[in-house]
Curated annotation (Swiss-Prot):
The keyword S-adenosyl-L-methionine does not apply. One of its GO terms (molecular function) is deubiquitinase activity. Residues 29-150 form the OTU domain. Residues 375-389 have a biased composition (Polar residues). This is OTU domain-containing protein CG3251. Pfam families: OTU. InterPro entries: OTU_dom, OTU_OTU, OTU_Tudor, Papain-like_cys_pep_sf, Peptidase_C85-like.
């Protein structure tokens, strides 16, 4: 058996790369692209300080609190009201600048090397006692990205491979994951010929390749079947083994032999210790694509009807934000009708007064009903187009609301009265009163719905009880008279 062929670590894409990336690569540097939003600076700092971009909002708020504490130091760099500047900085639609970068360097006790296009970088020393260094790339548009050395890329590729393999081996319990990754990414490995290593019972335990690589074969007791019908799997069902011919071939090996892939190539690249993928960027782009396609609110400033957010009612008190549910959005997206949870009423507010909830309070929408097949396949990382063929049609107006009630949802019982019905006056025959139907205060009020309004009774019930029904978008009201026995139930509107 020959020696193992060594592979060099590489990034995900090698073709059609940016000239700036090639310039940095020749100098043993790698630029990790960030999502093009206003939180790019805080994503970069969160990744290099906390090893994850998911804490970018917490890093933003730590920066705001630090600048508020050291206001004597940073106020002279801000033109205008400093408190208003910090208030806007706390919102995710406000981009960070060099001023915030300097504040976070003092906060986390780090100096920084700032790279620009076709520049080797300049060292900015905030304090000689700071031992650690941030490597940040900044373009002319004020967008920030992470710069890594090739040694960091090699280490990150190994850590990424270990994380994905733990997920697919120990959580999903797929058989022969290493073999599948090699089969999908390096098919030439198996063209030179293979051999099997057997144990004392005659079972194949390892696959040996001519280039020196070997792959441990899993046993059916510790894995689950990949086939749709596990009863037809000869690996996990020994009674179907045809004279031992396919007994040692796992369902993973059977799929590969039939030119079927068990998971996507992106997942296979993530499990390769010689490749580094920008998983955060691809995941964020995929999440935004699905949100645009299915009309899903993901907790940003692209609000949808039914989304829970925060509203600023008093322009003089920006620190007071009330929780609300968006009921409707006009076509120009300048005014929104919201239901104030604290006050229990509907209010028309400008769209600029709405702000998303903090990430720790935001609850993602459950849109499994809109793409059940796609959600099931994404759990296993498979590439399938079955979800797109289930009748899902992309929303032609993604800015409008999805046809679903806002969360949380009670048990709404709306009653519609047609506007063409002529007014009815005078007493009618007696009928047994029913339980009054109260409109749900959180529901989206549509044209034609009405609200029961009745004056409270002070004394004994009169001979005739009048109930007024206010019909929206109609020039009249309906008055119904009922007999006094039994007395009609009282009903008060929450509006």
């Amino acid at each position: 058996m020959s020696e193992v062929l060594q592979r060099l670590a590489s990034t995900e894409v090698r073709k059609a790369r940016d000239p700036i990336d090639r310039f940095l690569e020749r100098r043993q540097l790698f630029r990790k692209h960030m999502l093009g939003d206003a939180s790019s600076l805080f994503r970069v700092v969160a990744e290099q300080v906390y090893d994850t971009q998911m804490l970018h909002y917490e890093v933003r708020m730590e920066c705001v609190r630090y600048m508020f504490t050291k206001w004597k130091t940073f106020r002279r760099f801000v033109s205008g009201d400093f408190d208003e500047y910090l208030w806007h900085l706390g919102k995710t639609k406000t981009a960070g600048t060099i001023l915030e970068l300097g504040a976070m360097c003092h906060l986390y006790r780090r100096n920084v090397i700032i790279y620009e296009p076709f520049d080797m970088g300049r060292m900015v020393t905030y304090n000689k006692d700071y031992k650690e260094i941030l490597r940040i790339f900044m373009n002319s548009m004020g967008h920030f990205e992470t710069v890594l050395t090739m040694q960091d890329v090699d280490m990150a590729a190994v850590c990424q491979s270990v994380s994905f393999k733990m997920l697919y081996k120990h959580l999903f319990r797929l058989p022969d994951v290493d073999l599948a990754v090699e089969w999908m990414l390096y098919p030439d490995t198996f063209k030179m010929g293979t051999e099997y290593e057997f144990d004392s019972r005659g079972r194949a335990i390892r696959l040996l390749c001519r280039n020196g690589r070997s792959f441990k074969l899993d046993r059916p007791e510790s894995t689950i079947c990949l086939l749709e019908n596990s009863q037809m799997c000869p690996f996990h069902n020994r009674r179907l083994a045809m004279g031992g011919q396919f007994a040692d071939f796992s369902c993973m090996r059977i799929l590969l032999e039939e030119n079927n892939i068990p998971f996507s190539y992106l997942v296979a690249k993530s499990m390769d210790p010689c490749r580094y993928r920008n998983v955060e960027l691809t995941s964020a782009i995929e999440a935004r694509r699905e949100a645009y396609e299915f009309g899903i609110y993901i907790g940003d400033y692209n609000f949808k009807v039914g989304a829970k957010c925060q509203v600023q009612l008093d322009t003089n008190r920006r620190d007071l934000l009330s929780a609300c549910y968006i009921q409707s959005i006009d076509k120009k997206k300048s005014v929104c009708k919201v239901f104030i949870e604290e006050q229990g009423k509907l209010v028309d507010v400008p769209s600029d007064n709405l702000h998303p909830l903090p990430p720790d309070e935001f609850k993602a929408w459950d849109f499994a009903r809109k793409r059940p097949q796609r959600l099931h396949n994404s759990q296993m990382g498979r590439q399938s187009v079955q979800g797109d063929q289930q009748g899902f049609v992309p929303d032609p107006m993604p800015g409008t609301a999805p046809s679903m009630p806002p969360p949380p949802v009670a048990d709404p019982r709306p009653v519609n009265v047609t506007a063409q019905q002529p007014p009815v006056f005078g007493p009618s025959r007696w009928m047994e009163p029913t339980r009054p139907l109260m409109p749900n205060p959180l529901m989206i009020h549509q044209t034609g719905s009405f609200v029961f309004v009745q004056q409270p009774r002070v004394g004994p019930p009169s001979v005739m009880m009048h109930v007024l029904i206010i019909v929206h978008n109609a020039p009249y009201m309906l008055a119904f008279d009922h007999a006094p026995h039994p007395p009609a139930p009282q009903c008060t509107a929450p509006f």
